[in-house]
Amino acid sequence: MEKIFLIGVVCVILISIAVVDARKKKIPNILLGILFFCAVLSGFIFPEISWPDRIAGGILVSVVFLTVIWIRPGAFGAGDVKLMAISGLMLGVGRNLTAFGFATALAALYCLPGILRRDRKKESEIAFGPFLCVGILLSIFWGKAFIRWYIS
């Protein structure tokens, strides 16, 4: 029962983050704080993902984001980096990379029609948080199955 409750709370928080970021291009720290608390709780409620895997998951994608920011300032916001660090703590390395892959693919699909019509430049800014949130949700529910399918 606590697993379903925690997943429900995480879904509500991720939807809230997606809506706020889509409107304001900012992810509120209060929502990230609540999500962080849920991520820590998930370590006890879902022990099948080890703590070292969770910590590595939090660090890996965040380091990728920080590297991209260092190379191209403004490419991602600090909220995106924090969101993926928390996501990694919740999902572990494999599922967090899957979430990032889903998010990147969805963002590309969203931007591609505008680029092809020349309505949108390649340099145009979009809020990436909503795509990250959808990617995280997809990874929560189907990440493990996707990884198994991809590896086979």
Question: Where is each model-derived feature located?
Answer:
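A membrane-topology feature that recognizes alpha-helical transmembrane segments
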Residues: 1-152
